[in-house]
Amino acid sequence: MSQTVFITGTSMGIGAAAVRLFAQRGWNVAATLRNPADATFTDLPTVRVYALDVTDEAAVMRVVQQAHQDFGGLDVILNNAGYGIVGPFESATDAQVQQQFATNLFGVFSVTRAALPLLRAQQSGVIINVTSVGGRTAFPLNSLYHATKFGLDGFSEALWYELAPFGIRVKVVAPGGVATDFATRSLQMTVDPADDANPYIGQVRSVLDAFSSHGGTYSSAEQIAEVIYTAATDDSAQLRYLAGADAQQLLQTKAEMSEQDFMSMIRQNFGLA
C-alpha cells in the first residue's frame, strides 16, 4: 500500500520539488497551498491539491482531517510553509512581526497539533519541519526570521522526546541557501531599500548585496527535497539533517571558531565590518 505525505507550502521551491519527488517515488501526496491555481504538479495522478492558509487554525484542522480521510491515513507530515522578512527590527510593524510568527512558527504548531491524534492512533508517523541553517546561526537584519527558525528548531527537539513513546519520529531539515524565488516572491522588507533617510539603509543595502552575490553557492530545491525524502524514509531516530554544502560548511566553521571570531567573520561577509 502506498504511503502518504502531507506537505504545506507547495506553490514553489522546496515544497513543489518535494511534491514531485514523493509522487515520482510512488507516494500519495496531499499538497497544500494558499491558492490551488498556483499548483504546478496537477499532472501527477497520486497528488491531491488542497487550499490551505496555515495561519487559519480552523482550516488547518479541517484540511488535515480531510486528507487523512481521502487517503486512508497520513504517514509523513512535512511542515514547509514559510517566508522571510529582511530589514532592521526597529522598522518592523506589529503586523509584520505577527505574520512572520503566524506563518513560520504558529502554522507549524497548528498543523502538528491537528495531525498528532491521527498519528498517535496508528502508533507511527514522521513529522519533518523545514527550518534553515538560520535556525542554528544568525545573519544581520534577519532577526524576525531567525527568531521563528530558532524557535522551530527547539520545538522540534523537545517534540522528538515526547512523541517517541508513540512511535512518531520528529525530523528537522535545515537548508542553507536555496536557488528559488524565495528571495523575491517570498521575501518581505521592513524598510524600503531606496529610503536614504533610514538610519539602517547602509546595512540594508550591504546585506542584500551579500545575499545576491552568494547565489551561485546555493542548492537547488530538488537537492533539498532529496534530503527531505531521506529524512522521511531512513527509519532512523536522527533529529537534524543539514541540507546543502554551504550549510554544512558554515556550521562546521562556527564549531571551529570562537564566538567572537565567527561573528566578526559574518560581519565582514555581509560588508558590515
Where are each of the predicted segments found?
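Conserved glycine-rich cofactor-binding loop
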Residues: 11-12
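The beta1-alpha1 cofactor-binding region of Rossmann-like NAD(H)/NADP(H)-dependent oxidoreductases
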Residues: 52-62, 94
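A glycine-rich helix->loop->beta "capping" turn
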Residues: 66-79, 85
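Substrate-binding pocket helix/loop in short-chain dehydrogenase/reductase
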Residues: 88-89, 96-98
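Active-site helix of classical SDR
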Residues: 112, 148
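Residue(s) in the substrate-gating loop at a strand-loop-helix junction
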Residues: 132
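SDR active-site lid
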Residues: 165-237
